[in-house]
Amino acid sequence: SFPTRRSSDLSMTAYSKNTKIISMNGGFVSNAVCDTCTTVIPAEVGLKERLEAALAETKLQQYQVTEQNGQITIFAKGVPAHASTPQLGVNAAGVTFECLEKAGFDDDFVKFYNEHIGTSCDGAGVGLKFEDEYGALTLCNGIVKTEDGIISCTIDIRVPVTLKAADVRTMCEARLEDENGRIEIGEIGDPLFFPRESPLVNALYKAYVDVTGDTEHEPMVIGGGTYAKSLKNIIAFGPEKLGMNYHIHSADEFILVSEMEEAVLIYMEAIKNLLAI
């Protein structure tokens, strides 16, 4: 089916206070799972071997641990995924933090990250686990970087449309800081949402049904952001069929030619229907 878009966007940034990590850098964009991460830490006796053992039990595509000149370098390659579906990816930064703790690397920010962010995607660590009839809140760490000895983690959160900005702040305010780290909340963007019974959604859905003959599937509601938010009475409307992994925001992202051709027909009908409203 063609999705309609929902959710408001929330950005957070986690900062270290005290950490033994020399540097940690990974990810390229905030709206995708951090899929590569390189970390440098002080060497400790037996730590390299313990890290390798911990990393071997993960779902990383690739990892490498090297020790030289009193430092250990960890390279981790995960699986990219769109920030609205982070559970489909493997977060290289999150897995690295997790393995550092499992390997016995005692560090304040490692503890903070694992307690507040971790490798889960539901926001439970910051008190934001929530789900409504349109879907669950998602949390995605997209970028990790080190500047002037401080590690920062850029976090993308997609908030279900029924959860208000004031509620979000109330839910997480007690979980934003402790002696090991702090999290800053950015602005919460307005959601884009149209009820199923609205004339706009009905016009678009009718176009889809008339072209495909599919009456089984209702319009999809997803957590993706969209530039349609910049205009009034506009909704994002595009092809994404259930059961198909399009590798959105990942390597080898694609769409089938047959789906593009079908989409053209749907758009033609949609324009006719919209003109009739």
Language-model-derived ranges and their functions:
Residues 2-7:
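Short, small-residue-biased leader/transition segments that mark boundaries at the very start
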Residues 16-28, 59-61, 135-140:
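Short amphipathic beta-strand starts and helix->beta connectors
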Residues 32-36, 68-70, 135, 148-151, ...:
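A short, glycine/Asx- and small/polar-enriched loop/turn
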Residues 47-60, 88-90, 101-102, 167-176:
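Short amphipathic alpha-helices in soluble, non-transmembrane regions
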Residues 60-70, 106, 178-187:
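Conserved short beta-strand edge segments in small beta-sheet-based binding/regulatory domains
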Residues 67-79:
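Self-splicing inteins and homing endonuclease
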Residues 77-148, 158-163, 167, 182-277:
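An extended, acidic, His-containing surface patch that forms the Zn2+-binding/catalytic region
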